[in-house]
């Protein structure tokens, strides 16, 4: 997570006062918790309430650099500022951590077990899981849209804000819109998780804490913070409030902090406050607090006398009453209660209103005290001690706001539009209720002073309106003044005039699916997307392919070839038949020479890439290449030949794909070295030394970019000298194959299975080093990793690198005949349907192309790939099949039949395993031994060959490696030699 700092130093907290004598007592009063010290004279009240849906009425703000409360916290940094990028990255990382925790709770990533709640009916669990998965999908879509709008659209947004003054009224920065949408998504996630998880469980506690961190990150406006201030995921909108108002360029270290302000307090936030010595928390929330962890922690802290909690309930959208302001001023003036933390739900509107009124109250009190210190009503001087007694007199305060009159203030709620005159609002302060007068004045010279102070303290203002700045920030004149001033942030930002209903409706109707097509309607924010004549967005990649007009090996353009742009990366894959590989490779140059000669006889042309696939004559005796390119990764070509003829496959974007079964051997060649490698290792802290050694070699000697998983990146980030290691976000790996040229795995077969799970579509070539317990698929020894990696990176330049395209299975779960969202899996080993812990035999109907072929009555059934034929399928009695044989293995598990034997199906088969309605019990399904989940009656799993195989780099050749693994791992056909007669 990005650390956010500012130009000011850390906040200086006064030393904590000694602990108060006596114990604190707790009592339940009219639905509220009242906590007070038994021996103390003051009472503090905290309401156990919190808002379920956060208020969207962010009308006030504060900027750390200027300490100007006219800033709008809900607007956030200026569009295009680096603080905006940092704020988005914080939210992204918090959302990723929540996503990982939720997915781990749904299904344990190590064991693959999906825990079941026995207090919920089995039929209701899939519905609850669907709700959680739906919210996760919505959150992911919002993050992707926010990334495009906040990160990619910085220049476009900044230019949109530099328009006319009238149009600026209707503009809200993309970060503010993104935070608002994600806040509502967090509330939906809280509702969904409340029905699925038990908060008292360990997994429930972890998810709840991460959800609170994400909510705080969304509440926070994103302004920079000083060193020593808490992280935005602990406290949103954390700012110090000073006693005096000074110019912007003054150092905050020289000022005395009156108190701190910010957003809601969570369990982790309370722990931080106690660690820093805070003595008082002032809670402005009027809503019910639904955070049971926080309520339990604060109750314990108050009962032990560690902290005091005072509740001054203020309704959402209103300002505090005069009695509440008095009460708060009394708390601030009491040095025994410092440090003090003032907060509301988000730390925006109600908190800013209280700060504004407190400052006005203190300023007026000081001014009147100064006047009466010079002259009293009779023209005589007033003693200073009496004046100070007046300003700090308890008679100015009340014990609560129960007897106060609610403030009549203009509100901006949904459906209302407020046009606010800024200058009028700043000077037209109104409060109808005056201060209580409970204490009589013994000195006659003080009576006039007190009466004048009470009559003047009417706060002739609506503080919510008073926070609005001028509305010409992004005008030409305003921006010119801003750049000339050389300030980090302007003194005011745009007026958040409510947008018209049509713009709101048009933005809400934006389809998330439209982003995938590249044609997004950004009318609400005046975003422009270049489109082609047919509406599809342009892609600037160039198509490199062979001219379809080649006949008899001769180019149709009389031998003239078009010059091709130098691309960043180029690769080629040559397919060699094992029958001719020995003779053709004897001199080491035969395949390459034939390919070069073919390229000399062919002609290349360049055309603009469109949305449709590349078609045309793929036969390639003239050239033998097919386009496979991305500007961000190495370019690859796939050619198949049996030594007599040459065929070429139609390959989609950045993928090594099957178009028909093949028993030929493939060879990988890079025309230019790759640039990016993904380094994967076993789970946990194991193999970190090996990972450091490989990462250093790849970066320093081979000049490659090294990517690791986020958890591993956190470890590397704490090791000096490994700042070059990069990471990616596990929430969205849809484009990871476009960034990675090949994958290096450290561990056993489980790491390769994990790599297969990371890449849901295309998979880059995988080279694995055996550091696990079995390592059937890992044919490379770690001791020679430098030589093996160099052979892969440089392609051996003449012979290439032999690879095996390992078939995967595409599995999809259906319920009531409809596909379940998010239930699509690519399997490298096998998919298993079994009875689980049920006492009855499982009954599974097996269909092939919608035709019933058999019913499995036993412990279950295995559908395995050739790669998985040496795993669970072998243990169940299935055959062991070479990984290059295109087939599926159908193996029963302990069938209740003497005639049910394993069978092998072609790779064109489309299987469906269904739990019939008359089955005695439900079944369970697992994919590669993980992601285990329940199948109810009527559910089914459809299985077919995946278009995207997993290419693994061989040590020597695919057949030799396979037999060596059989002998090394399974002791295949090991016996003593027969002696001669």
From Swiss-Prot:
Pfam families: NAD_kinase (PF01513), NAD_kinase_C (PF20143), PTP-NADK (PF22741). Its EC number is 2.7.1.23. Residues 387-406, 551-563, 581-596 have a biased composition (Polar residues). GO terms for cellular component: chloroplast. SUPFAM superfamilies: (Phosphotyrosine protein) phosphatases II, NAD kinase/diacylglycerol kinase-like. It catalyses: NAD(+) + ATP = ADP + NADP(+) + H(+). It is found in: Plastid, Chloroplast. GO terms for molecular function: ATP binding; calmodulin binding; NAD+ kinase activity. Involved in chlorophyll synthesis and chloroplast protection against oxidative damage. This is Probable NAD kinase 2, chloroplastic.
């Amino acid at each position: 997570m990005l650390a956010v700092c500012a130009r000011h130093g850390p906040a200086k907290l006064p030393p904590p006062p000694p602990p108060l004598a006596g114990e604190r007592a707790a009592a339940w009063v009219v639905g509220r918790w009242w906590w007070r010290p038994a021996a103390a004279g003051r009472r503090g009240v905290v309401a156990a309430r919190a808002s379920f849906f956060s208020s969207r009425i962010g009308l006030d703000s504060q900027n750390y650099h200027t300490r100007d409360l006219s800033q709008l916290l809900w607007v956030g940094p200026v569009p295009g500022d680096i603080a905006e990028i940092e704020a988005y990255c914080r939210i992204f990382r918090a959302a990723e951590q929540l996503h990982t925790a939720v997915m781990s709770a749904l299904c344990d990533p190590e064991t693959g077990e999906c825990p079941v709640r026995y207090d919920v009916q089995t039929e209701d669990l899939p519905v609850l899981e669907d709700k959680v998965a739906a919210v996760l999908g919505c959150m992911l879509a919002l993050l992707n849209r926010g990334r495009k709008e906040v990160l990619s659209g910085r220049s476009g947004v900044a230019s949109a804000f530099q328009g006319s003054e009238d149009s600026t009224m209707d503009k809200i920065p993309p970060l503010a819109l993104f935070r608002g949408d994600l806040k509502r998504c967090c509330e939906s996630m809280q509702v969904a998780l409340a029905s699925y998880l038990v908060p008292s469980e360990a997994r429930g506690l972890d998810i709840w804490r991460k959800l609170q961190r994400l909510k705080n990150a969304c509440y926070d406006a994103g302004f920079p913070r000083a060193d020593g201030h808490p992280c935005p995921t602990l406290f949103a909108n954390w700012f110090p409030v000073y006693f005096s108002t000074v110019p912007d360029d003054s150092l905050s270290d020289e000022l005395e902090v009156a108190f701190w302000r910010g957003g809601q307090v969570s369990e982790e936030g309370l722990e931080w406050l106690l660690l820093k010595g805070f003595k008082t928390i002032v809670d402005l929330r009027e809503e019910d607090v639904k955070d049971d962890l926080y309520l339990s922690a604060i109750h314990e802290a108050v009962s032990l006398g560690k902290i005091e909690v005072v509740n001054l309930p203020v309704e959402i959208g209103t300002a505090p009453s005069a009695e509440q302001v008095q009460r708060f001023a009394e708390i601030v003036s009491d040095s025994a209660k410092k440090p003090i933390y003032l907060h509301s739900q988000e730390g925006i509107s109600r908190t800013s209103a209280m700060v504004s009124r407190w400052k006005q109250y203190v300023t007026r009190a000081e001014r009147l005290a100064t006047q009466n210190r010079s002259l009293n009503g009779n023209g005589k001087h007033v003693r200073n001690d009496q004046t100070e007694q007046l300003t700090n007199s308890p008679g100015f305060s009340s014990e609560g706001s129960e007897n106060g009159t609610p403030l009549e203030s203009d509100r901006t709620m949904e459906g209302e539009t407020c046009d606010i005159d800024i200058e009028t609002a700043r000077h037209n302060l109104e409060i109808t209720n005056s201060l209580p007068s409970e204490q009589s004045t013994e000195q006659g010279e003080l009576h006039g002073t007190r009466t004048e102070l009470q009559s003047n303290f009417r706060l002739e203002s609506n503080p919510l309106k008073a926070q609005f700045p001028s509305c010409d920030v992004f005008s030409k004149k305003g921006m010119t003044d801003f750049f000339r001033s050389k300030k980090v942030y302007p003194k005011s930002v745009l007026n958040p005039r409510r947008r018209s209903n049509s713009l709101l409706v048009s933005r809400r109707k934006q389809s998330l699916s439209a982003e995938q097509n590249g044609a997004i309607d950004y009318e609400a924010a005046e975003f422009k997307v270049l489109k082609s004549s047919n509406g599809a967005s342009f892609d600037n990649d160039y198509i490199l392919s062979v001219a379809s007009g080649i006949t008899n090996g001769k180019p149709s353009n009389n031998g003239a070839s078009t010059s091709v742009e130098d691309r960043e990366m180029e690769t080629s894959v040559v397919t060699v038949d094992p029958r001719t590989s020995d003779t053709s490779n004897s001199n080491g140059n035969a395949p390459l020479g034939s390919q070069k000669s073919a390229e000399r006889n062919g002609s290349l042309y360049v055309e603009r890439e469109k949305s449709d696939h590349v078609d045309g004559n793929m036969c390639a005796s003239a050239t033998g290449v097919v386009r496979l390119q991305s500007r961000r990764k190495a370019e690859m070509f796939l050619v198949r030949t049996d030594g007599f003829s040459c065929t070429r496959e139609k390959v989609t974007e950045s993928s090594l794909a099957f178009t028909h079964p093949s028993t030929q051997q493939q060879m990988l060649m890079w025309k230019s070295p790759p640039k990016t490698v993904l380094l994967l290792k076993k789970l946990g802290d194991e193999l970190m030394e090996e990972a450091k050694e490989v990462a250093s070699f790849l970066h320093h000697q081979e000049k490659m970019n090294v990517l690791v998983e986020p958890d591993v990146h956190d470890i590397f980030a704490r090791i000096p000298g490994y700042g070059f290691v990069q990471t990616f976000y596990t929430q969205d790996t849809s484009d990871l194959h476009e960034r990675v040229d090949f994958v290096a795995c450290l561990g056993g077969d489980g790491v390769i299975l994990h790599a297969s799970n990371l890449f849901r579509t295309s998979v880059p070539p995988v080279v694995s080093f055996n550091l696990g317990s079995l390592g059937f698929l890992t044919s490379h020894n770690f001791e020679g990793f430098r030589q093996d990696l160099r052979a892969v990176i440089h392609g051996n330049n003449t012979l290439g690198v032999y690879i095996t395209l390992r078939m995967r299975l595409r599995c999809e779960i259906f319920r009531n005949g409809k596909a379940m969202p998010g239930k699509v899996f690519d399997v490298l080993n096998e998919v298993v349907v079994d009875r689980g812990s049920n006492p009855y035999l499982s009954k599974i109907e097996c269909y092939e192309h919608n035709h019933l072929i058999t019913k499995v009555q036993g412990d279950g059934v295995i559908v395995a790939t050739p790669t998985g034929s040496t795993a669970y399928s072998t243990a169940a009695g299935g055959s062991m099949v070479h990984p290059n044989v295109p087939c599926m293995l159908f193996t029963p598990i302990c069938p209740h039949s003497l005639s049910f034997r394993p069978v092998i199906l072609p790779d064109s088969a489309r299987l469906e395993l269904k739990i019939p309605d008359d089955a005695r019990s439900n079944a369970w399904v697992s994919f590669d031994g993980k992601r285990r989940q329940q199948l109810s009656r009527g559910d089914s799993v459809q299985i077919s060959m995946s278009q995207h195989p997993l290419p693994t780099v061989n040590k020597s050749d695919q057949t030799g490696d396979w037999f060596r693994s059989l002998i090394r791992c399974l002791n295949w056909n090991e016996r003593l030699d027969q002696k001669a007669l």
